[in-house]
Amino acid sequence: MREILHIQGGQCGNQIGAKFWEVVCAEHGIDATGRYDGDSDLQLERVNVYYNEASCGRFVPRAVLMDLEPGTMDSVRSGPYGHIFRPDNFVFGQSGAGNNWAKGHYTEGAELIDAVLDVVRKEAENCDCLQGFQVCHSLGGGTGSGMGTLLISKIREEYPDRMMLTFSVFPSPKVSDTVVEPYNATLSVHQLVENADECMVLDNEALYDICFRTLKLTTPSFGDLNHLISATMSGVTCCLRFPGQLNSDLRKLAVNLIPFPRLHFFMVGFAPLTSRGSQQYRALTVPELTQQMWDAKNMMCAADPRHGRYLTASAMFRGKMSTKEVDEQMLNVQNKNSSYFVEWIPNNVKSTVCDIPPTGLKMASTFIGNSTSIQEMFRRVSEQFTAMFRRKAFLHWYTGEGMDEMEFTEAESNMNDLVSEYQQYQDATADDEGEYEDEEEEADLQD
Protein backbone atom coordinates (compact mmCIF):
# COMPACT_ATOMS: atom_id res chain seq x y z
CA MET A 1 0.00 0.00 0.00
CA ARG A 2 1.07 3.53 -0.65
CA GLU A 3 1.38 4.99 2.84
CA ILE A 4 1.53 8.65 3.76
CA LEU A 5 3.27 9.71 6.93
CA HIS A 6 1.67 12.71 8.59
CA ILE A 7 3.71 15.16 10.67
CA GLN A 8 2.31 18.13 12.56
CA GLY A 9 4.44 20.77 14.26
CA GLY A 10 3.85 23.81 16.43
CA GLN A 11 0.59 25.09 17.83
CA CYS A 12 -1.11 25.80 14.51
CA GLY A 13 0.06 22.55 12.91
CA ASN A 14 -1.13 20.47 15.84
CA GLN A 15 -4.54 22.09 15.90
CA ILE A 16 -5.06 21.65 12.15
CA GLY A 17 -3.67 18.14 12.37
CA ALA A 18 -5.98 17.12 15.20
CA LYS A 19 -8.96 18.35 13.17
CA PHE A 20 -7.71 16.49 10.10
CA TRP A 21 -7.58 13.20 12.02
CA GLU A 22 -11.14 13.73 13.22
CA VAL A 23 -12.25 14.05 9.59
CA VAL A 24 -10.26 11.06 8.32
CA CYS A 25 -11.45 8.89 11.22
CA ALA A 26 -15.04 9.79 10.42
CA GLU A 27 -14.53 8.93 6.74
CA HIS A 28 -13.03 5.54 7.53
CA GLY A 29 -15.52 4.72 10.27
CA ILE A 30 -12.91 4.64 13.03
CA ASP A 31 -14.03 5.75 16.49
CA ALA A 32 -12.05 7.68 19.11
CA THR A 33 -10.51 4.50 20.52
CA GLY A 34 -9.24 3.36 17.12
CA ARG A 35 -11.84 0.62 16.66
CA TYR A 36 -13.68 0.23 13.37
CA ASP A 37 -17.42 0.78 13.54
CA GLY A 38 -18.15 1.72 9.94
CA ASP A 39 -20.66 0.28 7.52
CA SER A 40 -18.80 -0.30 4.27
CA ASP A 41 -15.90 -2.49 3.16
CA LEU A 42 -14.62 0.41 1.09
CA GLN A 43 -13.69 2.22 4.29
CA LEU A 44 -11.23 -0.52 5.20
CA GLU A 45 -9.95 -1.35 1.74
CA ARG A 46 -7.11 1.17 1.79
CA VAL A 47 -7.21 2.31 5.37
CA ASN A 48 -3.46 1.56 5.59
CA VAL A 49 -2.61 4.77 3.74
CA TYR A 50 -3.00 6.71 6.98
CA TYR A 51 -3.33 3.98 9.64
CA ASN A 52 -1.32 1.15 11.10
CA GLU A 53 -3.37 -1.79 12.21
CA ALA A 54 -2.25 -2.87 15.68
CA SER A 55 -2.33 -6.51 16.76
CA CYS A 56 -5.49 -5.99 18.82
CA GLY A 57 -7.39 -4.76 15.77
CA ARG A 58 -7.10 -1.08 16.62
CA PHE A 59 -6.15 1.45 13.96
CA VAL A 60 -3.36 3.84 14.90
CA PRO A 61 -2.69 6.97 12.80
CA ARG A 62 0.69 7.18 11.07
CA ALA A 63 1.19 10.55 12.70
CA VAL A 64 4.11 12.27 14.38
CA LEU A 65 3.26 15.19 16.64
CA MET A 66 5.96 17.65 17.64
CA ASP A 67 6.16 20.95 19.49
CA LEU A 68 8.68 22.85 21.55
CA GLU A 69 6.27 23.34 24.43
CA PRO A 70 3.84 20.88 26.00
CA GLY A 71 0.67 23.01 25.96
CA THR A 72 -0.88 22.24 22.57
CA MET A 73 0.12 18.60 22.78
CA ASP A 74 -1.72 18.27 26.07
CA SER A 75 -4.87 19.70 24.55
CA VAL A 76 -4.60 17.32 21.57
CA ARG A 77 -4.11 14.45 24.00
CA SER A 78 -7.16 15.43 26.02
CA GLY A 79 -9.20 16.19 22.88
CA PRO A 80 -11.86 13.90 21.39
CA TYR A 81 -9.35 11.77 19.44
CA GLY A 82 -6.40 12.16 21.80
CA HIS A 83 -6.16 8.47 22.70
CA ILE A 84 -6.00 7.21 19.15
CA PHE A 85 -2.37 8.35 18.59
CA ARG A 86 0.62 6.26 19.54
CA PRO A 87 1.87 7.73 22.84
CA ASP A 88 5.53 7.51 21.75
CA ASN A 89 4.76 9.71 18.76
CA PHE A 90 4.24 12.82 20.87
CA VAL A 91 7.63 14.53 20.85
CA PHE A 92 7.85 17.82 22.72
CA GLY A 93 10.25 20.12 24.51
CA GLN A 94 9.60 22.43 27.44
CA SER A 95 11.23 25.69 26.43
CA GLY A 96 9.06 26.90 23.53
CA ALA A 97 10.38 28.74 20.49
CA GLY A 98 8.88 32.11 21.40
CA ASN A 99 7.85 32.88 17.81
CA ASN A 100 11.51 32.88 16.89
CA TRP A 101 12.46 31.02 13.71
CA ALA A 102 16.10 30.77 14.79
CA LYS A 103 15.11 28.99 18.01
CA GLY A 104 13.04 26.48 16.06
CA HIS A 105 15.64 25.94 13.35
CA TYR A 106 19.00 26.29 15.08
CA THR A 107 18.87 26.06 18.87
CA GLU A 108 15.84 24.62 20.69
CA GLY A 109 14.50 22.78 17.63
CA ALA A 110 17.89 21.33 16.73
CA GLU A 111 18.11 19.71 20.17
CA LEU A 112 14.77 17.97 19.72
CA ILE A 113 15.05 17.11 16.04
CA ASP A 114 16.82 13.76 16.50
CA ALA A 115 14.06 12.52 18.77
CA VAL A 116 11.53 13.47 16.09
CA LEU A 117 13.57 11.82 13.34
CA ASP A 118 13.74 8.59 15.37
CA VAL A 119 9.96 8.47 15.51
CA VAL A 120 9.70 9.32 11.80
CA ARG A 121 12.16 6.54 11.00
CA LYS A 122 10.22 4.05 13.11
CA GLU A 123 6.98 4.97 11.34
CA ALA A 124 8.62 4.84 7.90
CA GLU A 125 9.99 1.36 8.62
CA ASN A 126 6.46 0.25 9.45
CA CYS A 127 5.36 1.15 5.94
CA ASP A 128 5.12 -1.29 3.11
CA CYS A 129 5.84 1.25 0.38
CA LEU A 130 6.02 4.77 1.74
CA GLN A 131 4.69 7.25 -0.76
CA GLY A 132 5.57 10.47 1.00
CA PHE A 133 5.18 12.82 3.91
CA GLN A 134 2.63 15.49 4.66
CA VAL A 135 3.56 18.27 7.06
CA CYS A 136 1.12 20.67 8.75
CA HIS A 137 2.63 23.85 10.09
CA SER A 138 2.36 27.62 10.10
CA LEU A 139 5.07 29.91 8.79
CA GLY A 140 4.52 32.84 11.14
CA GLY A 141 5.55 31.29 14.46
CA GLY A 142 8.76 29.69 15.67
CA THR A 143 8.24 25.95 15.93
CA GLY A 144 6.11 25.17 12.87
CA SER A 145 8.22 27.43 10.69
CA GLY A 146 11.74 27.00 12.08
CA MET A 147 11.64 23.44 13.33
CA GLY A 148 9.16 22.42 10.63
CA THR A 149 11.54 23.45 7.85
CA LEU A 150 14.48 21.88 9.70
CA LEU A 151 12.59 18.58 9.81
CA ILE A 152 11.65 18.86 6.14
CA SER A 153 15.28 19.32 5.13
CA LYS A 154 16.41 16.39 7.31
CA ILE A 155 13.71 14.13 5.83
CA ARG A 156 14.75 15.32 2.38
CA GLU A 157 18.30 14.12 3.09
CA GLU A 158 17.18 10.75 4.36
CA TYR A 159 14.32 10.04 1.91
CA PRO A 160 15.28 12.01 -1.21
CA ASP A 161 12.91 10.17 -3.54
CA ARG A 162 9.71 10.39 -1.44
CA MET A 163 7.16 13.13 -1.99
CA MET A 164 7.06 16.00 0.47
CA LEU A 165 3.73 17.76 0.70
CA THR A 166 3.15 20.64 3.10
CA PHE A 167 0.05 22.44 4.32
CA SER A 168 1.53 25.81 5.21
CA VAL A 169 -0.43 28.55 6.94
CA PHE A 170 0.97 31.90 5.83
CA PRO A 171 0.75 35.07 7.90
CA SER A 172 -2.38 37.02 7.02
CA PRO A 173 -2.31 40.49 5.48
CA LYS A 174 -4.45 42.21 8.11
CA VAL A 175 -4.57 39.79 11.02
CA SER A 176 -1.14 39.55 12.59
CA ASP A 177 -0.28 37.44 15.62
CA THR A 178 3.32 38.52 16.03
CA VAL A 179 5.45 41.36 14.79
CA VAL A 180 8.19 39.11 13.45
CA GLU A 181 5.91 37.03 11.18
CA PRO A 182 7.45 38.45 7.98
CA TYR A 183 10.91 37.32 9.11
CA ASN A 184 9.77 33.83 10.07
CA ALA A 185 7.73 33.40 6.90
CA THR A 186 10.49 34.57 4.56
CA LEU A 187 13.08 32.32 6.17
CA SER A 188 10.62 29.41 5.86
CA VAL A 189 9.73 30.05 2.22
CA HIS A 190 13.45 30.11 1.48
CA GLN A 191 13.53 26.51 2.78
CA LEU A 192 10.26 25.34 1.24
CA VAL A 193 11.27 26.45 -2.25
CA GLU A 194 14.28 24.15 -2.06
CA ASN A 195 13.06 21.19 -0.01
CA ALA A 196 9.32 20.66 -0.46
CA ASP A 197 7.66 19.11 -3.52
CA GLU A 198 4.21 20.64 -3.15
CA CYS A 199 2.97 23.34 -0.78
CA MET A 200 -0.70 24.00 -0.20
CA VAL A 201 -0.85 27.64 0.78
CA LEU A 202 -3.44 28.57 3.39
CA ASP A 203 -4.01 31.74 5.27
CA ASN A 204 -6.20 32.69 8.17
CA GLU A 205 -7.60 35.83 6.67
CA ALA A 206 -8.91 34.16 3.54
CA LEU A 207 -10.42 31.48 5.77
CA TYR A 208 -12.03 34.16 7.97
CA ASP A 209 -13.53 35.72 4.84
CA ILE A 210 -14.99 32.40 3.72
CA CYS A 211 -16.50 31.80 7.16
CA PHE A 212 -17.87 35.29 7.27
CA ARG A 213 -19.05 35.73 3.69
CA THR A 214 -20.02 32.29 2.51
CA LEU A 215 -20.82 30.46 5.71
CA LYS A 216 -22.43 33.50 7.38
CA LEU A 217 -20.64 32.92 10.69
CA THR A 218 -20.49 36.18 12.63
CA THR A 219 -17.59 35.26 14.93
CA PRO A 220 -15.55 32.47 13.33
CA SER A 221 -13.31 30.56 15.75
CA PHE A 222 -10.08 28.78 14.89
CA GLY A 223 -12.16 25.61 15.09
CA ASP A 224 -14.23 26.82 12.13
CA LEU A 225 -11.12 27.74 10.13
CA ASN A 226 -9.52 24.37 10.86
CA HIS A 227 -12.73 22.67 9.80
CA LEU A 228 -12.29 24.21 6.34
CA ILE A 229 -8.63 23.25 6.16
CA SER A 230 -9.30 19.66 7.20
CA ALA A 231 -12.02 19.30 4.56
CA THR A 232 -9.47 20.33 1.94
CA MET A 233 -6.75 18.06 3.31
CA SER A 234 -9.12 15.13 3.24
CA GLY A 235 -10.09 15.99 -0.34
CA VAL A 236 -6.51 16.13 -1.55
CA THR A 237 -5.85 12.58 -0.43
CA CYS A 238 -9.26 10.97 -0.97
CA CYS A 239 -8.12 9.35 -4.23
CA LEU A 240 -5.46 7.47 -2.32
CA ARG A 241 -7.83 6.20 0.33
CA PHE A 242 -10.90 5.22 -1.68
CA PRO A 243 -11.44 3.58 -5.04
CA GLY A 244 -12.27 5.95 -7.87
CA GLN A 245 -12.66 6.13 -11.61
CA LEU A 246 -9.76 8.50 -12.11
CA ASN A 247 -7.24 8.09 -9.34
CA SER A 248 -4.22 10.14 -8.49
CA ASP A 249 -1.50 10.03 -5.89
CA LEU A 250 0.91 12.64 -4.52
CA ARG A 251 3.35 12.14 -7.37
CA LYS A 252 0.75 12.24 -10.13
CA LEU A 253 -0.54 15.40 -8.51
CA ALA A 254 2.92 16.95 -8.65
CA VAL A 255 3.58 15.85 -12.21
CA ASN A 256 0.37 17.47 -13.38
CA LEU A 257 0.67 20.65 -11.36
CA ILE A 258 4.32 21.67 -11.41
CA PRO A 259 5.63 22.93 -14.76
CA PHE A 260 8.82 24.37 -13.21
CA PRO A 261 10.33 22.89 -10.05
CA ARG A 262 10.38 26.05 -7.94
CA LEU A 263 6.79 26.98 -8.70
CA HIS A 264 5.11 24.49 -6.39
CA PHE A 265 2.93 26.72 -4.23
CA PHE A 266 -0.75 25.98 -4.78
CA MET A 267 -3.96 27.70 -3.82
CA VAL A 268 -6.69 25.38 -2.64
CA GLY A 269 -10.47 25.59 -2.61
CA PHE A 270 -13.32 23.39 -1.53
CA ALA A 271 -16.98 23.03 -2.47
CA PRO A 272 -19.70 22.88 -1.28
CA LEU A 273 -18.81 25.21 1.56
CA THR A 274 -20.94 24.33 4.55
CA SER A 275 -20.62 25.61 8.07
CA ARG A 276 -19.94 23.14 10.87
CA GLY A 277 -23.10 21.43 12.04
CA SER A 278 -25.31 22.53 9.15
CA GLN A 279 -24.67 20.20 6.27
CA GLN A 280 -26.31 21.34 3.07
CA TYR A 281 -29.87 20.10 2.73
CA ARG A 282 -30.10 20.28 -1.04
CA ALA A 283 -28.02 18.08 -3.25
CA LEU A 284 -25.56 19.96 -5.44
CA THR A 285 -25.05 19.38 -9.14
CA VAL A 286 -21.70 19.04 -10.87
CA PRO A 287 -22.05 22.47 -12.57
CA GLU A 288 -22.76 24.11 -9.20
CA LEU A 289 -19.79 22.41 -7.57
CA THR A 290 -17.56 23.45 -10.44
CA GLN A 291 -18.77 27.02 -10.31
CA GLN A 292 -18.24 27.33 -6.55
CA MET A 293 -14.89 25.60 -6.67
CA TRP A 294 -13.44 28.01 -9.24
CA ASP A 295 -14.89 31.04 -7.48
CA ALA A 296 -12.08 33.38 -6.43
CA LYS A 297 -13.85 34.12 -3.14
CA ASN A 298 -13.49 30.49 -2.11
CA MET A 299 -9.71 30.31 -2.35
CA MET A 300 -8.13 29.59 1.00
CA CYS A 301 -5.27 32.03 0.64
CA ALA A 302 -5.20 35.78 0.25
CA ALA A 303 -4.37 35.93 -3.44
CA ASP A 304 -6.88 36.60 -6.19
CA PRO A 305 -6.59 34.18 -9.12
CA ARG A 306 -8.16 36.84 -11.36
CA HIS A 307 -4.99 38.91 -10.95
CA GLY A 308 -2.85 36.23 -12.54
CA ARG A 309 -3.12 33.19 -14.75
CA TYR A 310 -3.35 29.50 -13.99
CA LEU A 311 -0.32 27.54 -15.10
CA THR A 312 -2.09 24.31 -14.13
CA ALA A 313 -4.97 23.19 -11.95
CA SER A 314 -6.39 19.98 -10.61
CA ALA A 315 -9.92 19.21 -9.48
CA MET A 316 -10.95 16.28 -7.35
CA PHE A 317 -14.60 15.36 -7.37
CA ARG A 318 -16.07 13.05 -4.75
CA GLY A 319 -19.35 11.20 -4.88
CA LYS A 320 -21.36 9.27 -7.44
CA MET A 321 -21.36 11.33 -10.61
CA SER A 322 -20.81 11.00 -14.31
CA THR A 323 -17.17 11.37 -15.34
CA LYS A 324 -18.34 12.69 -18.68
CA GLU A 325 -20.22 15.53 -17.00
CA VAL A 326 -17.17 16.40 -14.91
CA ASP A 327 -14.99 16.59 -18.02
CA GLU A 328 -17.56 18.72 -19.85
CA GLN A 329 -17.82 21.15 -16.94
CA MET A 330 -14.06 21.48 -16.60
CA LEU A 331 -13.69 22.14 -20.33
CA ASN A 332 -16.48 24.64 -20.07
CA VAL A 333 -14.62 26.58 -17.36
CA GLN A 334 -11.46 26.63 -19.43
CA ASN A 335 -13.23 27.80 -22.57
CA LYS A 336 -15.19 30.55 -20.85
CA ASN A 337 -12.21 31.88 -18.91
CA SER A 338 -9.46 31.12 -21.36
CA SER A 339 -7.69 34.41 -20.60
CA TYR A 340 -7.02 33.16 -17.08
CA PHE A 341 -5.09 30.12 -18.28
CA VAL A 342 -1.68 30.27 -19.91
CA GLU A 343 -2.03 29.24 -23.52
CA TRP A 344 1.37 27.55 -23.74
CA ILE A 345 0.22 24.59 -21.62
CA PRO A 346 -2.76 23.10 -23.45
CA ASN A 347 -5.23 21.00 -21.41
CA ASN A 348 -3.73 22.22 -18.19
CA VAL A 349 -6.61 21.20 -15.93
CA LYS A 350 -6.68 17.64 -14.64
CA SER A 351 -9.70 16.13 -12.94
CA THR A 352 -9.96 13.06 -10.75
CA VAL A 353 -13.12 11.37 -9.55
CA CYS A 354 -13.44 9.39 -6.34
CA ASP A 355 -16.64 7.46 -5.62
CA ILE A 356 -16.90 8.04 -1.87
CA PRO A 357 -18.12 11.49 -0.76
CA PRO A 358 -17.08 13.11 2.54
CA THR A 359 -19.14 12.31 5.63
CA GLY A 360 -22.55 13.96 5.49
CA LEU A 361 -22.38 15.11 1.85
CA LYS A 362 -23.59 13.58 -1.42
CA MET A 363 -20.94 15.25 -3.52
CA ALA A 364 -17.96 17.49 -2.96
CA SER A 365 -14.95 18.77 -4.82
CA THR A 366 -11.49 19.97 -3.95
CA PHE A 367 -9.57 22.40 -6.10
CA ILE A 368 -5.80 22.83 -6.34
CA GLY A 369 -4.51 25.56 -8.60
CA ASN A 370 -1.01 26.63 -9.54
CA SER A 371 -1.68 30.26 -10.29
CA THR A 372 0.83 33.02 -10.89
CA SER A 373 -1.26 35.27 -8.65
CA ILE A 374 0.13 33.48 -5.60
CA GLN A 375 3.00 35.91 -5.98
CA GLU A 376 0.75 38.47 -4.25
CA MET A 377 1.25 36.54 -1.00
CA PHE A 378 5.02 36.43 -1.35
CA ARG A 379 5.16 40.03 -2.47
CA ARG A 380 3.19 41.16 0.56
CA VAL A 381 5.37 39.26 3.03
CA SER A 382 8.46 40.49 1.25
CA GLU A 383 7.43 44.14 1.56
CA GLN A 384 6.85 43.75 5.29
CA PHE A 385 10.16 41.91 5.60
CA THR A 386 12.08 44.64 3.80
CA ALA A 387 10.48 47.41 5.84
CA MET A 388 11.79 45.87 9.07
CA PHE A 389 15.05 44.46 7.74
CA ARG A 390 16.10 47.80 6.32
CA ARG A 391 16.21 49.13 9.87
CA LYS A 392 17.46 45.81 11.27
CA ALA A 393 14.47 45.81 13.62
CA PHE A 394 14.15 42.77 15.90
CA LEU A 395 17.22 41.26 14.29
CA HIS A 396 19.05 40.75 17.60
CA TRP A 397 16.60 38.01 18.57
CA TYR A 398 17.82 36.01 15.59
CA THR A 399 21.53 36.85 15.64
CA GLY A 400 21.48 36.05 19.36
CA GLU A 401 20.61 32.47 18.42
CA GLY A 402 23.63 32.33 16.14
CA MET A 403 22.09 33.42 12.84
CA ASP A 404 23.89 35.61 10.36
CA GLU A 405 22.45 38.66 8.62
CA MET A 406 23.56 37.12 5.36
CA GLU A 407 20.93 34.42 5.78
CA PHE A 408 18.22 37.05 5.88
CA THR A 409 19.55 38.67 2.73
CA GLU A 410 19.64 35.33 0.94
CA ALA A 411 16.11 34.42 2.00
CA GLU A 412 14.87 37.82 0.89
CA SER A 413 16.42 37.57 -2.55
CA ASN A 414 15.25 33.97 -3.00
CA MET A 415 11.69 35.04 -2.32
CA ASN A 416 11.98 38.01 -4.67
CA ASP A 417 13.34 35.70 -7.36
CA LEU A 418 10.31 33.48 -6.84
CA VAL A 419 7.98 36.45 -7.34
CA SER A 420 9.70 37.44 -10.56
CA GLU A 421 9.60 33.86 -11.87
CA TYR A 422 5.84 33.82 -11.38
CA GLN A 423 5.62 37.21 -13.09
CA GLN A 424 7.73 36.04 -16.02
CA TYR A 425 5.44 33.09 -16.75
CA GLN A 426 2.34 35.21 -16.25
CA ASP A 427 3.49 37.52 -19.03
CA ALA A 428 4.74 34.76 -21.31
CA THR A 429 2.81 33.97 -24.47
CA ALA A 430 2.99 30.93 -26.71
CA ASP A 431 5.01 32.59 -29.46
CA ASP A 432 7.74 34.56 -27.67
CA GLU A 433 9.84 31.55 -26.78
CA GLY A 434 12.90 32.98 -28.52
CA GLU A 435 13.58 35.47 -25.76
CA TYR A 436 13.04 32.83 -23.10
CA GLU A 437 15.72 30.51 -24.35
CA ASP A 438 18.27 33.30 -24.00
CA GLU A 439 16.98 34.18 -20.55
CA GLU A 440 17.13 30.60 -19.41
CA GLU A 441 20.72 30.28 -20.59
CA GLU A 442 21.59 33.42 -18.63
CA ALA A 443 19.81 32.04 -15.59
CA ASP A 444 21.82 28.83 -15.84
CA LEU A 445 25.03 30.82 -15.90
CA GLN A 446 23.96 32.73 -12.79
CA ASP A 447 23.13 29.56 -10.90
UniProtKB/Swiss-Prot annotation:
Q: Which InterPro entries match?
A: Beta-tubulin_BS, Beta_tubulin, Tub_FtsZ_C, Tubulin, Tubulin/FtsZ-like_C, Tubulin/FtsZ_2-layer-sand-dom, Tubulin/FtsZ_GTPase_sf, Tubulin_C
Give a GO molecular function annotation for the protein: structural constituent of cytoskeleton
Tissue and organ distribution: Expressed in leaf sheaths and suspension cultured cells.
Q: What upregulates this protein? A: Down-regulated by abscisic acid (ABA).
Amino-acid positions noted as binding GTP in the UniProt annotation, renumbered to this chain = Q11, E69, S138, G142, T143, G144, N204, N226
Q: Where in the cell is it found?
A: Cytoplasm, Cytoskeleton
Region ranges (Disordered) = 419-447
Write down the required cofactor(s).
Mg(2+)
Gene3D superfamilies assigned: Helix hairpin bin, Tubulin/FtsZ, C-terminal domain, Tubulin/FtsZ, GTPase domain
Alphabetized UniProt keyword annotations:
Cytoplasm, Cytoskeleton, GTP-binding, Magnesium, Metal-binding, Microtubule, Nucleotide-binding
SMART domains for the chain: Tubulin, Tubulin_C
Highest taxon of the lineage:
Eukaryota
Q: Where is the composition biased (Acidic residues)?
A: 429-447
- According to its UniProt entry, what is the function of this protein? Tubulin is the major constituent of microtubules, a cylinder consisting of laterally associated linear protofilaments composed of alpha- and beta-tubulin heterodimers. Microtubules grow by the addition of GTP-tubulin dimers to the microtubule end, where a stabilizing cap forms. Below the cap, tubulin dimers are in GDP-bound state, owing to GTPase activity of alpha-tubulin.
Q: What is this protein called?
A: Tubulin beta-2 chain
For this protein's source organism, the top of the classification is:
Eukaryota, Viridiplantae, Streptophyta, Embryophyta, Tracheophyta
Q: Which gene encodes it?
A: TUBB2
